[in-house]
Structure formats: C-alpha cells, structure tokens
Amino acid sequence: GLPLLRLGGAFVLSGLMNSGCEFLIRAFLNHQGDLEVVGLLNAGITIVFVYAGMVFSVMDQDFYPRLSGISGSRKNEESVKERNLCVNRQLEMNVLLLGPIVAAIILGLPIIIPILYNAQFMGMLQMTQLAAVAMLFKAVYLPIEYLPLSRGDSRLFLIQESFCVILLIICEIAGYQLDGLRGVGGGIAVAYAIETIAVLIFSRAVYGYRLSALGFRFCIFQLLILLLVLFLVFMISYRDWLYWLIGVIIALMSTSFSFRKIRKLVR
C-alpha cells in the first residue's frame, strides 16, 4: 500500500509542478506583454498539447500496464532487455503515428486556426507551428519517462519532472525575450528536445535503457520531415499555391514512410 501511495503522491506533485509552471509563464507574459499575448499562447497550446495530446492518451492506455508487468530488478539483464524492447516498441509506434500528424497540423494551421477560433488569432500561427515540433520529441521521451513509474521509483520520477519543469520555464522566458510570442514556441520545442536528450542519458545510466537503431532511424527521418515543413512554412506564404502543393507532397512522404514501417512492425 505504501509504494502505491508514494506513486500517487508523485503523480499529484508532478501535476502541481506543471500547473505552477503554466501559471508562472502566463504571469511573466502578462507582465512583459499583455493579456492578448497570454490569450494567444493559451489558444496555441490548446491546439498543440490538448488535441494532439489525445493521441498519446489513446496509445498509452495499455503501455504502462505492460511495462509495469515486467518483473525483475534494474540490474537483471533479462528484465532490462524485456523493458527495453517494450519501451522501444512503444516509442517506434509513437514516432511513426505522430510524425505525419504533427506535419499535417503545422501545414494546416492557417486553416485550422480560423475554423477553431477566428482570423484575429492568426497572430499565434508561427508560435504554434514551432511549438508543434515538441510533440515529436514528446513521442520519443514519454515511453522512456514511464520507466521510473513502472519500477515504483517515485523520487526519481519527481527529480526528472522537476528538471523538465524548470527547463521549460527557462526556455519559454528566454524565447519570449529573444523573439516575442514566436520565440515562446521555439523555446517549447528546444525545451522538449533537451528533455529528450536528458531522459535518454538518465534512463541509460539508471535503468540500462538503450534506444533501438530502428527507433533512432524513425526519429531522424520524421525530424527531418518536420524541419523541411518548418522551412516551407517560414519561406513561402500559405496564400501561395506552392505552399500547399509542396506541403502535401512532404506530408505524403511522411505518411507513406510511417504506413510502410507500421505494416512491417505489426506483421
């Protein structure tokens, strides 16, 4: 009962830290900018993290029970291999599914924003496009972050979460100081990229986790696709037909790659 209580407490504290992070960021933006900036940030975050986050909720429903069901200590070689396999399979599927979705969101935001809100919210377009890249990094690190929880290591989980929260606050504030609202989106993407690297290093040291070669290749391909998409959206106006032609081609490349790889994985 006590380990379960500690785990529940870790979840609650993690939620409080994330809520505190959001409050601090919004208070800073309200002080440095105005309520309009805060409103645009809230709207952009809702599109990226709430709507795209629903995909994570669906995919992770059966992952945590499977990971928790693997017995054995951190040092048990067979258990480490089994956990690595479980995490890597989930990570690979996350990246393959989220890659095309994020690419489509970034490309389609000029249409999505007026539909969900109105044309007055187009000021958050570039910020939201940059922040959306963070979803690919989240697809990578989220399955790995479950390792402390699956082992009942609530203290390590909280240390990990504390680092991530502090990093996000620093990157968002620095981004706003450098490039206004658009910089906040870039700061979010940078924070998630650093978090991914930190989680990989931490999990390698503590749990013996190793990212699979296949997962690494999937990550690199989908990241290059998103960088190509960002180059497109910042170089060509969405009012130009070339934007949509090239955008559809890039999105189809990502979708085709993911579809072929998923078919191989599920066989």
Describe the residue ranges of each PLM region.
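Transmembrane helical elements of multi-pass membrane transporters/channels
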Residues: 1-69, 134, 138-142
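N-terminal membrane topogenesis motif
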Residues: 1-14, 84, 88-92, 257-267
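Juxtamembrane helix-entry segments on the extracytoplasmic side of multipass membrane proteins
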Residues: 2-6, 39-42, 119-129, 242
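Short runs within selected transmembrane alpha-helices of multi-pass transporters and secretion channels
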Residues: 14, 18-22, 45-48, 60, ...
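Residues that define the loop-to-transmembrane-helix transition and helix capping
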Residues: 36-39, 88, 122-125, 154-155, ...
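Helix-loop junctions and terminal segments of transmembrane helices
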Residues: 44, 48-95, 145-150
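Alpha-helical transmembrane segments of multi-pass membrane transport and lipid-handling proteins
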Residues: 55, 59, 84-138, 169-177, ...
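Membrane-proximal transmembrane or re-entrant/amphipathic helices at the cytosolic face
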Residues: 230-267
